[in-house]
Amino acid sequence: MFQNNFNKNFVVVNNQALNGRSSKSFIDEGKWANVKKLIKKGDYVLIQFGHNDAKTDTARHTIPGSTFDQYLKQYASETLKLGGIPVLMSPCARRKWKNGVLVDSHGDYRLRAKVVAKSLNVHYIDANAITEKLEKQLGEEGSKKLHLIYAAGEKASYPNGVEDNIM
């Protein structure tokens, strides 16, 4: 979706994100090493984690204010070293509603990218605030269109339905 906001004649978006990865597992699986090979001088590198870092499995878990910050610093520092321009981003808001109120599900992870960006003097985008505002504007029912949510039989590729939010 992000890449659809740019004129393809002027901006190339090379999305290397992978579902389910944390700041730790993306490095441990060698995915970051592959991305580094692609970074050229002047490239903007958008770095967004936190969505899966709170998972309890040791392959993905990081600690905000500690290991999570260390990984974000590694991404940003290595991007700078390669001549790229790192942009740290907070995680997008999850669709988690309780009694008609959107509930934060990222805790301290949502704040750490800002802290790290400031400490390194690099760019920062508060994707959590932007997406949280959009979720709230659309409301609990309307925000479904932002997510992978289909009832059984509604979409051929998901015959049994699918719901990717946290309720």
Regions found by a protein language model. Name each.
Residues M1-A17, A33-K41, V45:
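Serine-esterase "nucleophile elbow" of acetyl-processing enzymes
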Residues R21-S22, D126:
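Short, solvent-exposed coil/turn linker segments
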Residues A17-G20, G50:
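Glycine-centered flexibility sites
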Residues S22-G30:
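Structural motif
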Residues N19-R21, A93-R94:
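Short, internal active-site loops enriched in acidic
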Residues G30-I166:
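Alpha-helical cap/lid subdomain in secreted, periplasmic
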